[in-house]
Swiss-Prot record:
Main subcellular location of this protein, as a coarse class: membrane
Designated gene of the protein: ctaB
EC code: 2.5.1.141
GO molecular function, one term: protoheme IX farnesyltransferase activity
InterPro entries: Protohaem_IX_farnesylTrfase, UbiA_prenyltransferase, UbiA_prenylTrfase_CS, UbiA_sf
Catalytic activity: heme b + (2E,6E)-farnesyl diphosphate + H2O = Fe(II)-heme o + diphosphate
The species this protein was found in: Bartonella bacilliformis (strain ATCC 35685 / KC583 / Herrer 020/F12,63)
Enzyme class: transferase
Name of the protein in question: Protoheme IX farnesyltransferase
């Protein structure tokens, strides 16, 4: 038998489930980490420096380890509120599969190791950038902002937007306007992405006492801000083409995709009741995932075609 993720023997004695490799992988937030790895890879590849494949692999591996360590640290700190939310109750710590102590040790080792290896094997500028990103995500966002302000995801979203700049820094040892534009796309995309999620899962956040925008300012204010941020995101996404860094394929694609993103946000803005809002919010949320992946994917593909096939 099982009760709330705990296992019972035949005589009803409570025992802790044994953690598996998959539980420790889940602790790394693999879905979030996959986005971190992908955007970092794009930043590394589209930089002006052509890196050796092995060098690039090591750099991305270090970023992945750091992203996973940060995700695990986040789960360690938020174990109390994860236990209150249906969406997160089955995570390794609240389900009792991994203790908070083990999670802290595991995540700390990964975080420190990623920065050390990045510095020794790649360069110390990108290593310090990675360390700052981990610090920002855990201390600024997770510990400080998330539980006190509905603007948590706006400011804290910077942590999720840094990876392409870290990838760029790994290749070049510096940052530039072009890498900052990649950061800006993700930074502006984050609020409409997460707030559309909150519009159809607000009860979860409310139960955990997290002040997300729909619960604090209401659905109408949230929809207004989603539309504004979607427009800003669409404009920022055209930036690499305007500056001349990206080509016409990216320029046309980012314009079309940006228009679609704004259209979904506009449809959401037009809804009045909660029942009308939920299905459109879900569509907006899932399209936002596709949108970001497509923007970075097209940028990467166009760059590879131009530099390694046409040239």
């Amino acid at each position: 038998m099982s009760i709330s993720g705990k296992l019972l023997t035949e005589d009803n004695q409570l025992i802790s489930p044994v953690a598996t490799v998959y539980d420790y992988i889940a602790l790394l937030k693999p879905r979030v980490m996959s986005l971190v790895v992908f955007t970092a890879l794009v930043g590394l590849v589209v930089s002006p420096v052509v890196v050796d494949p092995l060098y690039g692999f090591v750099a991305i591996l270090c970023i992945a380890i750091g992203g996973g360590g940060a995700g695990a640290l986040n789960m360690w700190y938020e174990a109390d509120i994860d236990a209150l939310m249906k969406r997160t109750q089955k995570r390794p710590i609240p389900s009792g599969k991994i203790s908070r102590g083990k999670a802290l040790i595991f995540s700390s080792i990964l975080s420190v190791l990623s920065v050390f290896l990045m510095g020794v094997l790649i360069n110390w500028f990108s290593a310090l950038f990675l360390a700052f990103t981990i610090f920002f995500y855990i201390v600024i966002y997770t510990i400080w902002l998330k539980r006190i302000t509905p603007q948590n995801i706006v400011i804290g979203g910077a942590a999720g937007a840094f990876p392409p700049m870290i990838g760029w820094a790994a290749a070049t040892g510096t940052i530039s306007l072009d890498s900052f534009l990649l950061f800006l796309i993700i930074f502006m995309w984050t609020p409409p992405h997460f707030w559309s999620l909150c519009l159809f899962s607000s009860s979860d956040y409310e139960a955990a006492g997290i002040p997300m925008m729909p619960n604090v300012r209401g659905e109408r204010s949230t929809k207004n801000q989603i539309l504004v941020y979607a427009i800003i995101t669409a404009v920022c996404a055209i930036g690499p083409y305007i500056t001349g860094y990206a080509g016409i394929i990216y320029g046309i694609s980012s314009t079309i995709l940006g228009g679609m993103f704004v259209y979904f946000a506009y449809r959401l803005w037009k809804t009045d009741t909660h029942d009308e809002t939920v299905p459109i919010a879900k569509k907006t949320f899932f399209f936002s995932l596709f949108y970001l992946g497509a923007i970075f994917g097209i940028l990467l593909i166009e760059f590879l075609i131009w530099h390694f096939i046409i040239r």
